[in-house]
Amino acid sequence: MIKLLFFLFISITYTVSDALASCESNKLTIYSAMSKHVFYVEIADDPTKRANGLMFRKSLKNFDGMVFLYDKPSRLVFWMKNTLISLDIIFFDERGIIKKIYVGATPLSQKKILGGSNLIGALEITGNLSSKLGFSEGDSIQFNLLDNKKAVWPCY
């Protein structure tokens, strides 16, 4: 019994400390059904940064990305104008729940990519990576700039 309690204590302590380690300012973690993946992100949180996004970049490392954050939930529409690399765009709500994943957006396209409504942000990562890692709608993210009172995975 003591061994079991010790094991549970260690497991819970590890899980909590591991989750908190994902709350550093430049890290965003995606929790999927069977795994978690940490991305090192740039933050686009003002109109100029959001307008420029990842335009004119010639490459993007796996597990790097850019997170776009908005002040209040809204309808998000993206495009790939002047973006030279294929991207996946992962749209999420204010709780950090992934609502839509657009896989393999075409470079330089001016086609509108509709994320949906009531969204607080989007994460752009290397094209087709979300499929390779098994991400799906309903998965969740942890990020230090989400409202802790609403986030499924808060940062404290």
Language model regions located:
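Compact, glycine-rich, soluble single-domain proteins
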Residues: 20-156
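Cleavable N-terminal signal peptides
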Residues: 7-8, 18-20
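Sec-dependent N-terminal signal peptides
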Residues: 4-13
